[in-house]
């Protein structure tokens, strides 16, 4: 007689894997998802040094450069990875492929000057994972696992309120960050006796939930007196421990912190009297995660470099961007996700809006990521 058993019982009775989740080499965007701003097209090289609505989270010090109110929004794809599972159930072999995934709003922000500086409010998606696994005919001792399917989703959203102040050559900023972490793990399988080809049991599990936590972000931005075309910036976001996530804490229970160092350099008049080029480099060090969770996190360094050439033609400024991003594995079961990036912006003269279209092509294969960002000067043209 077929039995439908809960996860823990079926794993024990039939001697299956002791973990509800087993990841293959999944491209790692759990912490390092680019929210899709202007900087995405330049390898993520300008988040620490740029001044826009993203600064509330990435570096609140640069809010101090904003002298008129602005609104920003970004849309991008959220990649999905799918893996075909072969071999035995307790020693699985994964053959993976990445897909474009769904489209979503990944940033909404507002910045406005106040008496002594600038306040920024933002929603930003900073991490994403959606991995699906499927296989059948997986040997497991004297039994066989058929119709195996498992899906794991992780999404980290940050809600931030920050303040930045322009103090001459050096800006300072700080903010409060609320993290909302969504986790889902769903799995189904059938246990079969290969001698009789009869189903002897099934296992179904569906665990999901949200956890929230409170953290902080601080930043500093410096422009040397003797080199006004250079900016050096640093920001630090604390690790965030999650609360209210009893059902999913074994899967993921702490959002790693991030220390960021960024440099940007401007040069003028390369190919035209008004044109200028901006070069950038950024290093993001993720730290303070937990290695003993189902989605493990270790300390790791993500690097980005790129350039933006600003062309003045047809009554508009056209930023053209190229870059590279190197994102190594952030934990066991994950793979690097490096990318070549490019993008185009549009800044019409005497208008309040700006548009940015950016792309990132993973070097390991898969569809090209795409983002659309729009900025609107609420308080007038800067």
Regions found by a protein language model. Give the residues of each.
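Short, intrinsically disordered low-complexity segments
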Residues: 2-3, 15, 75, 81, ...
């Amino acid at each position: 007689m077929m039995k439908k058993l809960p996860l823990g019982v079926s794993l024990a009775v039939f001697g299956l894997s002791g973990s509800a989740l087993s990841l293959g080499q999944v491209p790692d965007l759990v912490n390092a998802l680019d929210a899709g701003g202007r900087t995405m097209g330049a390898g993520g090289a300008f988040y620490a040094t740029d001044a826009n609505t993203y600064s509330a989270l990435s570096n609140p010090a640069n809010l101090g450069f904003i002298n008129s109110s602005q609104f920003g929004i970004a849309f991008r794809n959220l990649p999905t990875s799918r893996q075909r599972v072969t071999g035995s159930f307790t020693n699985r072999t994964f053959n993976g492929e990445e897909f474009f995934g769904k489209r979503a709003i990944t940033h909404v922000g507002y910045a406005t000057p106040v008496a002594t500086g600038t306040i920024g409010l933002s929603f930003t998606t900073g991490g994403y994972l959606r991995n699906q696994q499927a296989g059948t005919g997986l040997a497991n001792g004297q039994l066989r696992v058929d119709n195996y399917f498992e899906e794991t989703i992780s999404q980290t959203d940050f809600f931030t309120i920050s303040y930045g102040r322009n103090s001459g050559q050096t800006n300072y900023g700080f903010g409060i960050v609320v993290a909302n972490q969504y986790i889902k793990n769903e799995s189904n399988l059938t246990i079969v006796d290969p001698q009789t080809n009869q189903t002897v049991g099934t296992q179904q599990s569906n665990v999901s939930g949200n956890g929230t936590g409170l953290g902080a972000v601080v930043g500093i931005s410096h422009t040397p007196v003797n080199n006004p075309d250079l900016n050096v910036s640093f920001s630090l976001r604390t690790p965030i421990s999650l609360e209210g996530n009893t059902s999913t804490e074994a899967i993921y229970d702490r959002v790693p912190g991030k220390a960021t160092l960024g440099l940007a350099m401007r040069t003028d008049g390369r190919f035209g009297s008004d044109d200028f080029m901006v070069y950038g480099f950024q290093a993001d060090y993720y730290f303070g995660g937990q290695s003993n969770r189902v989605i493990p996190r270790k300390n790791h360094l993500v690097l980005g470099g790129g350039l933006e050439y600003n062309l003045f033609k047809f009554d508009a400024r056209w930023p053209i961007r190229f870059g590279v991003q190197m994102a190594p594995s952030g934990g066991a079961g994950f793979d690097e996700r490096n990318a070549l990036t490019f993008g185009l912006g549009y800044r019409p003269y005497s208008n309040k809006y700006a548009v940015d279209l950016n792309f990132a092509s993973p070097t390991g294969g898969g569809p090209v990521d795409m983002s659309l960002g729009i900025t609107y000067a609420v308080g007038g043209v800067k």
